[in-house]
Amino acid sequence: MFELIFPGWLAGVLLSLTTGPLGSFIVWRRMSSFGDTLSHSSLLGIALSIAFNINSFYAILILMSFIAIILAWLEELLPVSLDTVLNIISHSSLSLGMVFISLISSKKEINITNYLFGDLLSVTKNDLITISISSILILSILLFRWHSILSSTINEELSQIDGINVLYARLTIMLMTAFTIAIAIKFVGALLITSLLIIPPATAQHFSGSPEKMVIIAIIVSILSVTGGISLSVFYNTPASPSIVLCSSFLCLISNIKKHFY
């Protein structure tokens, strides 16, 4: 039994190392809709990968990176709220992806459930290697660019005065988030990956007094959620990814109760 669940648990832990800090930046920037936009657009990437018979990871990564670059640029130019643009792109790409998949499924057999909810317990050794390399790469970039990204998140005007390229810092976060989602979507699913990005940092903010502490607590909450969710899946035969999200939501609920009553 241990040999069956350990790869999935380890994959969840490795993903937590990146979703914790990236999710914290998304929460600080109040860009929770950004994660939804990328995860929903991944369905369009999946449809295109099936239609053109290319690797789904590359199709999703290219599409989401393109969307991230466009959004970083549009945020500088558009007079409307970024949330408005995010919602338009999110639902348009989701609808377009579902239409394409519906058209393709008449010729090819497609299991859309795996794309929507993932399968964390199907992780292979090669998957673990890919996730490990990706996590090391993203964490290295975050550590190297931590000051500029954090400064531009807290106050863009002061960051510009200090000579920080705010657009570049914003684009770095968006592209790293796109890369993480492209890696994780196979195991967590398009509909649940945003939850793993947003809920742990939302839980951690009630216990932290500094950005660094919030990131660490978000990672711990995420690892606890992965451990609890996989345990629930093993003992009660529930889907792994939804079980992880439920555990994460439960921890968030507990943190809110603590905030209001203690």
UniProtKB/Swiss-Prot annotation:
It is a multi-pass membrane protein. One of its GO terms (biological process) is zinc ion transport. It is found in: Cell membrane. The chain crosses the membrane at residues 8-28, 54-74, 84-104, 129-149, 179-199, 215-235, 238-254. One of its GO terms (cellular component) is ATP-binding cassette (ABC) transporter complex. Its main location: membrane. Pfam families: ABC-3. CDD domains: TM_ABC_iron-siderophores_like (cd06550). The keyword Transmembrane applies. Keywords: Cell membrane, Ion transport, Membrane, Transmembrane, Transmembrane helix, Transport, Zinc, Zinc transport. The keyword Transcription does not apply. It comes from the Bacteria. SUPFAM superfamilies: ABC transporter involved in vitamin B12 uptake, BtuC. Involved in the high-affinity zinc uptake transport system. Belongs to the ABC-3 integral membrane protein family. NCBIfam families: PRK09543.1. PANTHER family: ABC-TRANSPORTER METAL-BINDING PROTEIN, HIGH-AFFINITY ZINC UPTAKE SYSTEM MEMBRANE PROTEIN ZNUB. This is High-affinity zinc uptake system membrane protein ZnuB. The lineage of its organism: Bacteria, Pseudomonadati, Pseudomonadota, Gammaproteobacteria, Enterobacterales. The gene is znuB.
